[in-house]
Amino acid sequence: MPTFEFIAFDADDTLWHSERLYADAQKRFAQLLANYHDPEWINDRLYQTETRNIQHFGYGIKAFALSLIETAIELTERRISSQEIQEIVGWAKQMLNAEVELLPQVSQIIPRLASQYPLMVITKGDLLDQEMKIRKSGLENYFQHIEIVSQKTLETYGKLFKKYSITPSRFLMVGNSLPSDILPILKLGGSAVHIPYEITWLHETAEQPPIDQTGYHQLETIGQLPPLLERITQNKE
């Protein structure tokens, strides 16, 4: 019997690059408003707007674009032109149409694990955008279930455990976000593997659990996941 009933993966910045697109757009945004404020102030105000808007628009590129526009209007005191707003909309379209670039070793590791464990994706964000990226990734058929959610909370995971009759102690979540992918799972009694990404959005930061906490593991790359699973299996035998 496999050690885990399910291994679930976050998608953005766990299976493929995503935050790079946002970081690039944020740099262009700071350049667009350079005549009004310095980059640090612009980025700080944008973060405040994004945080405030999550309850209204959720996560994803469309929500990000709306926050860019709102911030631009505020910071320019309504002096931003319609042409400049159209430029921001253009960035969002470019982001939505961007190719999906898998992280190193993902294309080898996911098929390998799919032959040994039931796999699923649990990702948050805009439904249409996430569905499109999953299709573009070429990984869709390796996952038995794909769940696109608005938030990753204790309640969200609890409902998914109930939906799929999952025993928390036999569930493993793999992701790059401590508050979204790791901490809720540990609180529910599951196991979690944190694989930090090169860029971390401020909203996804949190204090790291003790390295010796039961069920918690940290890796540098997804390529280290199969050996970790082997060690976990051996320790439970």
Set out the residue ranges of the language-model regions.
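Active-site neighborhood of HAD-like aspartate-dependent phosphohydrolases
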Residues: M1-R45
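Long amphipathic N-terminal alpha/beta scaffold segment
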Residues: E87-S107
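A metal-dependent, Asp-based hydrolase signature
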Residues: T49-Q94
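Asp-based, Mg2+/Mn2+-dependent phosphohydrolase catalytic module
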Residues: M1-F4, Q83, S107, P111, ...
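Short, surface-exposed acidic
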Residues: A34-E50, E77-I88, Y142-H145
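An amphipathic alpha-helix signature
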Residues: A23-A30, A65, I69, L127
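Conserved phosphate-coupling serine/threonine residues in phosphotransfer and NTP-handling enzymes
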Residues: T123
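Glycine-centered short loops/turns at secondary-structure junctions
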Residues: Q116-Y117, G189
